[in-house]
Amino acid sequence: MFWGYSLSFGTDINGLIGGLDFIGMAGVGMEPHATIATNLPHMVFMIFQCMFAIITPALITGAFAERMRFSAFLIFIVLWCTFVYAPLCHWVWGGGWMFKMGALDFAGGAVVHMSSASAALAAALVIGKRKGWGKRSFLPHNLPM
């Protein structure tokens, strides 16, 4: 929200990433933007896009379950959203090179689902099996408790 929206929907920089126009939500108000979602308030569009930015890393969590410390997972999510999700979002939805080539992504098929599936598969392959898998039975647990 502080920089991701700007990197995704800021002024196009060579089709690769958005500029820092909206960093810290600067210029995001209740008036419609001139080029981004011209039929609804800019703030509403930003919140709608935040929903996708939240759901996408949540889909990856299944690959990390019981394989990574929560603090490491949070660091991964911040880095992944900055260096993977934001550029991909800009490419497809924010006026980047794929958008200019005519790519259409309805309901997040490429930006959300393909990126989270690729990240989850890569993470599962890199991290490997859970510690103790096949050697002992796992005790049930509840993370919030």
Segments (PLM) and residue ranges:
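Hydrophobic alpha-helical transmembrane bundles of multi-pass membrane proteins
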Residues: 1-145
